[in-house]
Amino acid sequence: MKYIGSFFKANSLSKEEIASQLLFLSKESVNHIVLESRCGISTNYKNLKENFKKDEISFFKNNTPLICIYKKAKPNIYSSKYSKTWDDTTFKKDIPVSSNALMTLSLLRLCSYYEKFKNINSALYKRAAFYKNLSKLQLEFYYTYLRNPEGFFVNKKNDESSSKSGLNISEKEDEMSYSDQALMMLAYYMYSKVAPEDSDSKTYEDFALQILNMFVNFKEELYSLSLDECCKIDSCLNNMLLYSNNEDCKLLVLDLSDFILNKYYESNSTFSNLETTSLLALNMYLSYKNTNILIFKDAYLDLIELFCNMFNDEKGIILKGTDKKEYKYSNMEICLYLTNLLMSFDLDEDSSDKRENIISKVYKNYIVNSGIVTSFPDAPNLDSHERYKKFSLKPDDLIDESMFRMTNANSPELTGLAPIFTKNLKYSTKKSIFTSDKTTFDSTKNMFIFFVFINSFIDKYIDFITDTPKEKKNAMLVEEIDSLKNVQKINKLPKLNNFNSKTPIVPPDAGESDFNSITNENQVDEISPPPTNPNLTREISEYSDSSIDKKEDLDDKMKNILDSTDL
C-alpha cells in the first residue's frame, strides 16, 4: 500500500528514512542548481568538449554547468532552451567564497555515490567522472579569479559591462574571512584525494597543505576570532583530518576544539545562539571521531541532552530562551539541530524513544509542513537502479518511496520552484502556526545545508543501498581519557534561559582589487591552468613565529605568507 495518509506517514518515519530524505533532497538540489539553474557563471558546451571525454558529457549536452555560483536568486523554474533554468533577471551576482567552496565539496562527496554504479549503470557512473572534472574547473576558476592581490580568497562580484566582450569580476568591500580560507583548503585537499588519478592532484594537495600550515604556525592568533568563526574553521579542520590523518592537523583540531568548548562554557552562552551551539556540537562529534578523546564525546552528548530539553513536546517546537510571542529560526540552525540529533545515535547506542520522537516532530513541523523547503524532488523512477538495494532491479530489493520523499510533498513540477530552503521560519505562539520567509535562494545558506546533509549521511546511505554489513562496534578507543593536556576543568552546560546571540567578530579588511573582463556573459571559454607555481611546494615552516614581529596581527602574518608563496 503506497499511500497511507499524510498524517500517519509523517509520524511513522524512522530516523533512517528522515536522514535518507534529507540526503536525497540535497543531492538532487545540488544536481539541479549546478547543471540547470544557470545561477552563476557557467561553462559552455564547447569548453566541456575540450575538458571532458565525449562519453562523459553526452548526458549533459543540454546543461550549462556552473563553475561559480551567485549569492542570491529567485528559484522560479521556467522552460527554455536551457532546460529548467532560473530567471536570470533576479540574480544577485555576488560570488561568495563560502558558497563556491561548499558547492565543489558537495560535488566531490557525491562522487563516492555515483562511483558505485560502475558496470551497473553507465550514465550514473559517468556522472562521477563528470563531477570530478567539473570540480577541477571550479577550483581553477577560484584560484584565478577569487583571490585578492595578497592571495586571500575573497568575495567577488560579477559586474555587468557595457562592452559586449564580457563581464568584469571585481572585488567587494567585504572583509576577508578566515573560515573561507579553511573551506578552500578543504576543497582543494578533497579534490586531491577524490581524484588521485589526476596528474595535478599532488599540486592541489600541496596547495591545501600550505594553507593548513599557515593556520598551524599561527594558531595562537586564531583564538582572538569569534566563537562562530572558530567553529567554522574547526569544522573544516576536522573534515580535512578525516581524509588526511595529518598529524599537524590533528594537533590543531585538539587545540581548537578544546578552545571553542571552553570558550563556550566560560561565556555562559553569551556568544551562543542555536546555530553556533549546533555547529559546536557537530565539531565535538567530529573531534571525538577523529581523536577518540572522551571529553569531546561527553560534551557532545551533553549538548544533545540540552537540545532535547529545548524541545517542547506539547507544542512541537524548539524553545529559544524564555516564552515569547514569536520564535524566529534560521534555516541553518534548524538543519544543524536536526543533523546533530540524527547523528547522536552513533555515539549513544541506547535506543532513545524521546530523541526519535523529537526528530520526527522537528522534521514534520519544521521541514515538511512549514514551507521552509519550496519543493521536494520526485523519487527515482521504478526502472532506475537507484530505487533498488544492490542496484538489482529486482522487486524484492525495491526501496520504498519513503526513503526519498514524503508521498504528499509538492514536487518542483507542481510548485514551479526549485527545491531549496528559504532563509527563515517564524512560529507564532498565539496562532500556533509556522510561516516561512519570502521565497529567495541564498547560496551561502543553502550550499552549507546541502553539504552538511550530504557529508553527514551519504556514507551510511551507500552502506544501506549496497547492502554492506554493518561494521563492528567499538571502533573507538575504549580507554578512559577524561581530559587533554592543559585543558581546564569543564563546567556544566549553561541553563536554557541563558541563551542569547552575539554578533561574531569580523576579521580585518583584506583590501580591494580590480579585475579584467574574463568571459562572455554566463560563459567561460578559457580557464587558466591549475596552480603549478613551483613556489607552491616550498615549505612554509620558514615563516615561523621567531621570524615575525610578535606585535603583527594575524592578518599581516597571513598576508606575508600568502604573498611570499604566491598562493
Stretch-by-stretch model annotation:
Residues M1-L567:
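Glycan-recognition and catalytic cores of secretory/periplasmic carbohydrate-active enzymes
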